Amino acid sequence: MSAASLKVTSTARPGSRLAVEVAIPAERSQASYEAAISQLSRSVNLPGFRKGKVPRSVLVQQLGGLRIRATALENLVDAIWRDTIKQETIEALGQPEVDGGYEALLESFEPGKPLSITFEADVAPTPTLKTTKGLKAEAESVSFDAAKVDEMLEQSRRQLATVVPVEGRKAAQGDIAVVGFKGTYSDDGSEIEGGSSESMDVDLEHGRMIPGFIEGVVGMTVGDSKTVACNFPEDYPKEDARGRKASFEIELKDLKTRELPDLDDDFAKQASEQETLAELRTDLEKRLKDDAERRTTSNRRDALLAALVEQLEVELPETLVQQEVRNLVEQTAAQFSQQGMDVKSLFTPDLVRNLMETSRPEAEERLRRSLALSALAEAESLKIEDPEIDAKVKEVTAQLSGERDIDPNRLRQAVIEDLLQEKLLGWLEENSTVTEKAPDKDKPSVTDA
């Protein structure tokens, strides 16, 4: 029976879902039943009969009519759905649900009689934009901060410093203290898990330890012991320690400091590929200016994309949302794995459920951005031509010449997506207005990185 003979009635449902009612003629339900008997006769083992040679009456008696009907219906449902989405050109996502449930459908299924099945499935969304031109947005402009050059030079000096022992003075800010310590909670006197050490190097810099610890060590002399009061911050990683007061018995066992190299041409050669300090400063300035420019562009485009999403009209299908949530969780797992963590033991079922729940808002936002750009490409007929794609694929392939297992089809698709996104964002900038807004004072400077 061809799919063209199916009578189909489709009704849109909320959440980018489609209800599809299919009228199945009697002859097709009978054909599925006959096919099920043939299928089971070839696979079932009955004493005294060869496979495929079991008489029909014996097969029905041994297996029971319910099993045969269930097999027939299962095959029928699968075949009808495949034929329906092909006939109606339905872009379905995932597997459909049978309205009323499979068990109820099985009860009403009689081979040789007409049958009506209502499927419900997520379908690809159809995003539209209320407008594409004249969008307005505000974005932070990132300025080059010359003071960051000196900060980066100081960081390099610290990395190249020589550690030497300290004699004849007390511990000071910036020193390296070798301490033994034991911590207990002030409220119940219990020992702090992980809060003790026989010997540990501690940089005496603000923020290295919980509040009160560094301040307590500063001013001590090698051989001194003292008890220091500390406070665990409210955002401390270990939940049971958050906000609690603690005391640490600290012994200063040794004291060291860093001798920084002179800020001169020799330092520049040691710290970089530059020959002089002046060249190193120029190189750092260029990097910071380029970084500020990239971040400014990124801020502008993020703001424009947010403005475009505000114009988006779409219903997100749950199938796509869950797929994007899984992608985010897998990315998190991959990041942990790259850091050397045991993902299998770390990612318990409870943690995965929590991650999936907390990742949902980001997943939905990512989908909206992607769909907004797709709608823009459709509305403005923006696309990438083959010569541009070929040139970029050639360039990327050359950069990945040492890599193995490169799928050329996936690489080409990734190149197309990147080029199209760049073109769409560029088009948005040309056809929208972005005004500068004051930086968020609570936000760390982007050039700190």
UniProtKB/Swiss-Prot annotation:
Pfam families: FKBP_C (PF00254), Trigger_C (PF05698), Trigger_N (PF05697). It is found in: Cytoplasm. Residues 437-449 have a biased composition (Basic and acidic residues). Keywords: Cell cycle, Cell division, Chaperone, Cytoplasm, Isomerase, Rotamase. GO terms for molecular function: peptidyl-prolyl cis-trans isomerase activity; protein folding chaperone; ribosome binding. One of its GO terms (cellular component) is cytoplasm. GO terms for biological process: 'de novo' cotranslational protein folding; cell division; chaperone-mediated protein folding; protein transport; protein unfolding. The keyword Isomerase applies. Residues 174-261 form the PPIase FKBP-type domain. Its main location: cytoplasm. Consists of 3 domains; the N-terminus binds the ribosome, the middle domain has PPIase activity, while the C-terminus has intrinsic chaperone activity on its own. PANTHER family: TRIGGER FACTOR CHAPERONE AND PEPTIDYL-PROLYL CIS/TRANS ISOMERASE (PTHR30560), TRIGGER FACTOR-LIKE PROTEIN TIG, CHLOROPLASTIC (PTHR30560:SF3). Belongs to the FKBP-type PPIase family. Tig subfamily. Involved in protein export. Acts as a chaperone by maintaining the newly synthesized protein in an open conformation. Functions as a peptidyl-prolyl cis-trans isomerase. This is Trigger factor. It comes from Synechococcus sp. (strain CC9311).
